[in-house]
């Protein structure tokens, strides 16, 4: 491999890690401040100017906390589980396109990790792989509450992943490609797929909230029932990895939603990466708004909603899309 190509890969990897860590830190701060506003109180405002050094204080606190391993735990899998979760989340974000290719010092620079013909499929595979970390973490802890949290995670993943996939297939049919770059380019003239696939967008976002274990679908870690769910026995840096993976998954799934339905990085006047950041921020605000507004569902209702409401709606939307695309193709 040429040295320039290797250097490009290293720089891209370092940039992705920097973006992920920075976005996580200030997304967490933004969430705490927003929820404070929703509840008519102040959020973090003591550490640094207006509280903007609070993420740094949280990191220092977690670094110095004891990293305990339960006596009955499988030590190898217990340590490996958070690494699987964070690696899958960071790997997935590298597939989201941030902008059109540009030229720098005579070389083409792409604003994405890899433009694969099946990048959407690979991204879903990586996202699903991250849940094995949650399942392994709960099982390896040797704790009944952790195991129940893992079982709930597996059931919730199976229940909502199908509906999310079906909602994405409608976009793939309309764009005629599984490449995220091609899907963005198909919406470049402001024919955003949220306008032609509104039902698919709603299904995708509901499933996205469930896939990231966010309220009101945060049953795998319901503190009133399971202490803390799959990460009950985790502390210190291992706990922070699970925490980081959850928020990175929120960013990834918001990036995918913006790419599939809101035109991704396309838009007039502003740089592509800034357009994508604006759209992702809007979708992240929806995550936080739902957390501050809606109560947690009962577990049986969560399952019934996934199988008896969301999946039939996603299937009907896909069938209608297939008919419309087929008729348009014949013409």
Regions picked out by a protein language model, each given a short descriptive name:
Residues 1-331:
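Selective transmembrane helix interface/packing segments
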């Amino acid at each position: 491999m040429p040295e320039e190509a290797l250097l490009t890969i290293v720089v891209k990897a370092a940039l992705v890690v920097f973006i992920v860590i920075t976005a996580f830190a200030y997304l967490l701060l933004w969430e705490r401040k927003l929820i404070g506003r929703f509840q008519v109180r102040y959020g973090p405002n003591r550490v640094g100017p207006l509280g903007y050094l609070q993420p740094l204080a949280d990191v220092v606190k977690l670094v110095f906390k004891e990293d305990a391993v339960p006596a009955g735990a499988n030590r190898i899998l217990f340590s490996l589980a958070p690494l699987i979760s964070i690696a899958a989340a960071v790997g997935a974000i590298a597939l989201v396109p941030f902008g059109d290719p540009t030229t720098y010092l005579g070389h083409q620079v792409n604003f994405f990790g890899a433009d694969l013909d099946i990048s959407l499929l690979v991204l879903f595979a990586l996202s699903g792989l991250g849940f094995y970390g949650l399942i392994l973490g709960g099982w390896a802890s040797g704790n009944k509450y952790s195991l129940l949290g893992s079982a709930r995670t597996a059931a919730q993943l199976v229940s909502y992943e199908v509906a999310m996939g079906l909602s994405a297939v409608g976009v793939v049919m309309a764009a005629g490609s599984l490449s995220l770059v091609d899907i963005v380019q198909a919406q470049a003239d402001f024919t955003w797929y949220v306008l032609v696939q509104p039902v698919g967008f709603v299904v995708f976002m509901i499933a996205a909230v469930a896939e990231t274990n966010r309220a009101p679908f945060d049953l795998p870690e319901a503190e009133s029932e399971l202490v803390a769910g799959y990460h009950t026995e985790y502390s210190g840096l291992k706990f922070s990895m699970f925490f980081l993976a959850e928020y990175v998954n929120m960013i990834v799934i918001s990036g995918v939603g913006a790419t599939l339905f809101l035109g991704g990085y396309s838009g007039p006047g502003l740089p592509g990466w800034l357009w994508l950041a604006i759209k992702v921020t809007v979708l992240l605000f929806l995550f936080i708004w739902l957390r501050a507004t809606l109560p947690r569902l009962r577990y049986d209702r969560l399952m019934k909603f996934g199988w008896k409401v969301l999946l039939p709606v996603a299937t009907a939307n896909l069938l209608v899309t297939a008919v419309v695309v087929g008729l348009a193709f014949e013409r």
